[in-house]
């Protein structure tokens, strides 16, 4: 009698739980495909420019594997997946910033960014600036020079002339309606048109900046890229992109806890 009473419940669990698991885990495929397709998207960041595409590929493959294992796990014994779930659990801790020692080994995590900007004693590293020199001819972009120089090599200038350039991606210009940030660059969508009509944004050897509309400096294009690595440290750590990584870590930890 007891075995017969459990048959309807076993039937419901065997049919509906796999279906529910499939629909709940379906967004993993979408996120994996998005990260895989966007892995070659330019992220202008000095230290992680070469590592972010690899991290995105690794995360997309992991999401696909998690999708398959979560659905296969409905038909297999949980013990067969225990080792994988433990690994995913600690990876989720790393991305959410809870497991601080391991978090520094993952490039996009908040602890990794904090490790880059602090030397362990709470002091800032040597300030470096990325200087973008633009050469234009008849309104068309001809050449872009990107280089890093130490802060002491830059001559002083009037901050009032460029209220939002010195602070780079950290200070948003006043009514620009900026939408997002990709670790170094604020992006606005409501400004369209040709690149800046200026020969040089800032010159290492004392040239005067001539910018007609500094709001245009925040459009997502090479010709208007300029940022200060050091003043952006707080905003980078608290940027929306890192918020997504934190949510991803919480999701992994919660999912593995439910599987357990």
Swiss-Prot record:
Any one annotated GO CC term: membrane
Annotated InterPro entries: TET_plant
Keyword Glycoprotein: yes
Superkingdom of source: Eukaryota
Membrane topology, as annotated: Multi-pass membrane protein
Localization annotation: Membrane
Swiss-Prot/TrEMBL keywords: Glycoprotein, Membrane, Transmembrane, Transmembrane helix
Glycosylation sites: 182
Nucleotide-binding recorded as keyword: no
Protein function: May be involved in the regulation of cell differentiation.
The family this protein is said to belong to: Belongs to the tetraspanin (TM4SF) family.
Protein name per UniProt: Tetraspanin-14
